[in-house]
């Protein structure tokens, strides 16, 4: 049995007893029922995920998958491909936005080279799982082989398992890859059936001509390859990216180990579509951090029946939104665990009648 198949079979359902107990405790804490809104429902979801009635999330980590895209050569991005490798080094040196926000909440940043088109120097904080020097240009040929697609997902699973084995109890997804909004839009269009123009945005800031070119390239690729929306590996093979597959694996690995996973922006959303097409049972384990500026993100939420925690007009990626989302998860669980009940505090409850 492959690692992918084994992982999918290990994904269960939410622990209803733990969730019910968490909700019962929320209802007697010193506040009107429901007064903390999503923080309350978030804590109950996390109780169901972990099977703990009062979960404590003390060891967060964000897994940042980095890879390049052959389709970037078609002029679909505002930045050159070498920025991918340059930003990976920035991550490793602690100078990127993701590093700042991760330090803010005490989260570890795990950087994975799953397909950067450069030979990166060895570094103690870099995990080298390179599947190739970027994907192929999917406007003229499949982005990768089916074997590579499965490998990408399994690399993500293994990275999640390793992080959890080291004590991580809350995971987030992050990405780096010039051209990856193009691949993500192609994945989203393929799986949801939405028109390409409806799910394709400006990425890192392309102009009108660049956006028109990006849409045309994706439409050309979908017409050429006809990816099967019911077969996630087929979609990943034909129009995906190595980091998208890797992040799908992180999601599946976290779900199989009953660890909450906070998904970042549009690229992580495309990965979530891959993951949940492979294993629909993974959906309840997902926590959507933010609504990205990328126009296709709402199609992801609609398809997966997810509601993001916040909308701050963000579009950076890297896991920045997901790390902010992890801080809300921690806050929600601390409310559930540390607040006093009406009985404990000697506070009168709601007058009935």
Swiss-Prot record:
Keyword flag Glycosyltransferase: yes
SUPFAM superfamilies, per the entry: Nicotinate mononucleotide:5,6-dimethylbenzimidazole phosphoribosyltransferase (CobT)
Gene Ontology MF: a single term: nicotinate-nucleotide-dimethylbenzimidazole phosphoribosyltransferase activity
Reactions the enzyme catalyzes: 5,6-dimethylbenzimidazole + nicotinate beta-D-ribonucleotide = alpha-ribazole 5'-phosphate + nicotinate + H(+)
Record keywords, A-Z: Cobalamin biosynthesis, Glycosyltransferase, Transferase
Enzyme Commission (EC) number: 2.4.2.21
UniProt superkingdom: Bacteria
Pathway: Nucleoside biosynthesis; alpha-ribazole biosynthesis; alpha-ribazole from 5,6-dimethylbenzimidazole: step 1/2
UniProt-annotated catalytic positions: 318
UniProt KW Signal keyword: no
GO BP annotations listed: cobalamin biosynthetic process
Catalytic class of the enzyme: transferase
Family: Belongs to the CobT family.
Role description: Catalyzes the synthesis of alpha-ribazole-5'-phosphate from nicotinate mononucleotide (NAMN) and 5,6-dimethylbenzimidazole (DMB).
Name the UniProt record assigns to this protein: Nicotinate-nucleotide--dimethylbenzimidazole phosphoribosyltransferase
Organism name: Roseiflexus castenholzii (strain DSM 13941 / HLO8)
């Amino acid at each position: 049995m492959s690692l992918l198949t084994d992982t999918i079979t290990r994904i269960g359902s939410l622990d209803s007893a733990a969730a019910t107990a968490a909700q019962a405790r929320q209802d007697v804490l010193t506040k009107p029922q429901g007064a903390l809104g999503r923080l309350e429902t978030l804590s109950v979801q996390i109780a169901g995920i972990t099977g703990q009635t009062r979960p404590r999330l003390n060891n967060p980590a964000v897994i940042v998958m980095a890879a390049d895209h052959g389709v970037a050569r078609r002029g679909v991005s505002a930045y050159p491909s070498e920025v991918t490798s340059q930003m990976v080094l920035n991550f490793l040196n602690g100078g990127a936005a993701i590093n700042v926000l991760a330090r803010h909440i005490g989260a570890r940043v795990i950087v994975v080279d799953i397909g950067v088109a450069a030979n990166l120097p060895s570094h103690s904080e870099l995990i080298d799982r390179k599947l190739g020097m970027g994907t192929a240009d999917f406007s003229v040929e499949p982005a990768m082989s089916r074997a590579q697609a499965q490998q990408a997902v399994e690399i993500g699973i293994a990275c999640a398992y390793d992080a959890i084995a080291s004590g991580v109890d809350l995971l987030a997804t992050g990405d780096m890859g010039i051209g990856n909004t193009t691949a993500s839009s192609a994945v989203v269009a393929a799986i949801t059936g939405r028109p390409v123009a409806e799910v394709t945005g400006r990425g890192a800031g392309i102009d009108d001509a660049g956006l028109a070119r990006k849409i045309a390239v994706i439409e050309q690729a979908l017409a050429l390859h006809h990816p099967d929306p019911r077969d996630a590996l087929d979609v990943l093979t034909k129009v995906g990216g190595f980091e998208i597959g890797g992040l799908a694996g992180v999601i599946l690995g976290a779900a199989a180990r009953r660890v909450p996973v906070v998904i970042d922006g549009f690229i992580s959303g495309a990965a979530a579509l891959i993951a949940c097409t492979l294993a629909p049972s993974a959906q309840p384990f997902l926590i959507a951090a933010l609504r990205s500026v990328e126009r296709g993100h709402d199609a992801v939420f609609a398809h997966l029946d997810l509601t993001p925690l916040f909308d701050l007009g963000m579009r950076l990626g890297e896991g920045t939104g997901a790390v902010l989302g992890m801080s809300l998860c921690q806050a929600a669980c601390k409310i559930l665990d540390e607040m006093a009940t009406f009985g404990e505090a000697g506070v009168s409850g709601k007058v009935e009648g």
